[in-house]
UniProtKB/Swiss-Prot annotation:
Function: G protein-coupled receptor that plays a role in numerous physiological processes including regulation of energy metabolism, neurite outgrowth or cell migration. Promotes self-renewal and neuronal differentiation of neural progenitor cells through activation of the NOTCH and WNT/beta-catenin signaling pathways. Modulates the KAT5-dependent glucocorticoid receptor signaling by modulating KAT5 subcellular compartmentalisation.
SUBUNIT field: Homodimer, and heterodimer with MTNR1A and MTNR1B. Interacts with KAT5. Interacts with RTN4 isoform A/NOGO-A. Interacts with TGFBR1.
Record keyword GTP-binding present: no
Disulfide bond entries: 109-186
Tissue distribution of the protein: Strongly expressed in the brain with highly restricted pattern of expression, confined to a subset of the ependymal cells of the third ventricle and a population of cells in the dorsomedial hypothalamic nucleus.
Stated name of the protein: Melatonin-related receptor
Induction remarks: Expression in the brain is highly responsive to energy status being decreased by both fasting and high fat diet feeding. Induced by TGFB.
GO molecular function: melatonin receptor activity
Source domain of life: Eukaryota
Organism: Mus musculus (Mouse)
PROSITE patterns: G_PROTEIN_RECEP_F1_1, G_PROTEIN_RECEP_F1_2
Extracellular side: 1-38, 94-111, 173-196, 269-281
TM annotation in the entry: 39-59, 73-93, 112-132, 152-172, 197-217, 248-268, 282-302
UniProt keyword annotations, A-Z: Cell membrane, Disulfide bond, G-protein coupled receptor, Membrane, Receptor, Synapse, Transducer, Transmembrane, Transmembrane helix
Amino acid sequence: MATVPKSNMGPTKAVPTPFGCIGCKLPKPDYPPALIIFMFCAMVITVVVDLIGNSMVILAVTKNKKLRNSGNIFVASLSVADMLVAIYPYPLMLYAMSVGGWDLSQLQCQMVGLVTGLSVVGSIFNITAIAINRYCYICHSLQYKRIFSLRNTCIYLVVTWVMTVLAVLPNMYIGTIEYDPRTYTCIFNYVNNPAFTVTIVCIHFVLPLIIVGYCYTKIWIKVLAARDPAGQNPDNQFAEVRNFLTMFVIFLLFAVCWCPVNVLTVLVAVIPKEMAGKIPNWLYLAAYCIAYFNSCLNAIIYGILNESFRREYWTIFHAMRHPILFISHLISDIRETWETRALTRARVRARDQVREQERARACVAVEGTPRNVRNVLLPGDASAPHSDRASVRPKPQTRSTSVYRKPASIHHKSISGHPKSASVYPKPASSVHCKPASVHFKPASVHFKGDSVYFKGDTVHYRAASKLVTSHRISAGPSTSHPTSMAGYIKSGTSHPATTTVDYLEPATTSHSVLTAVDLPEVSASHCLEMTSTGHLRADISASVLPSVPFELAATPPDTTAIPIASGDYRKVVLIDDDSDDSDCSDEMAV
């Protein structure tokens, strides 16, 4: 603080307070009355424009959907920082100018200094955040949405204000806040601590200026390099340049307005004896008034250079002429905002539910299939025991290879013509050992009618060592309206006769093809099954589900015959039981 002669010291209108006599002996400013009146009017205009303009900026960002982005969130935060000085310090400054000094308490002086520091430091930090946001938007556009998402932007905003508070609080203990009659306000006095003064100025002013200058330099280089590219919309390019220029002008105005105050502060702190008497009082007053005037310039710059802000300003001015309409529109906008957020959350929940349902439906086929069906071993399966891939060459199927077991009610006719039902239950696949190496089948164009097929044969002997004959689908006859998947298992007996002769099956009707030798599969069994020449078989396939618990066959053991079935779409092996009364063998089959 500059020293003044004793003759300039005199009593003021200050009165004693509980915090001490503030301003009992202060230097009288040597300003002419006209200058004081001019400064008073300028500060009144500054306060009014500051409050109205920054309020309109906040309303514009809140109401206009085009202005609701991460960059303008920092613009609204900058407006809040500018409004702080217009709410508390500037009115007290006007009061001090009107009464000719400070006659308020020391606590109010401390609060004025604290709020002023928060406003100034908050403004420069928000300008730095705006510059970084513009830099990421133009120079790193691919990562912009990830870096400045809504959640991240809110975090950056909180961090900005936390850094502002941490930067100002040390001044409350290290630097002393005193009333300066040259500026009619309470400021930080760093005369007794020059090192701390230089550090504060570098952190609060110089370092942010370097960061902002670097960001805008890179942005300008990027804009010049991308001028008039092929396929670029000129309107969009012009809008980006205007937006960049708006933020750059805001930065320049802040630097120009606050640079004189910071320079004077550093000079007085470093060389107080030389500079104290050389700096006139009016220069201090002009420097601080220019700095204070910066708080109302930002809203004006937005309205001049940004078309979206300008349109919103006109809307707000029109609404101010009709307060009821303005309040109604404001309530409607708030309701629409909440409804939009609720709808967004509902859409997110619905999308998550649809994804969960799709995942559940994707696994329902496997989860709903019995384990004994899912573990059916097909010929050529690599996990089958004792398998020989070389001997099994099944033809690739055009349909799904998964086996779905359909129920089959097989009615057998005896020689006398009376039907005798044979109940067939499937056995678990774990009790049957299959050896696909001995099963050979070749598809043939043999058509088979379920209830009118007659077989002629004298002695047909089969030899099998506990084989699994699997079929995927059969082509149904007149009594069946859809193809059915079946799997047959032959459980070996105790006798092991050798193979004698094999008679080829010939259909009795002339409407069916005759099976040739290459069409018959060779199935070896460990017991002898004989089929009479007069056996009449009729197959009736139903659509009910097969029971999973095995049950016994009829009293008379059946003859098991392996018949290859081949149609235009399905080529499978089907096991058919012929219940003959004179058979001596007992067998269990799982279909």
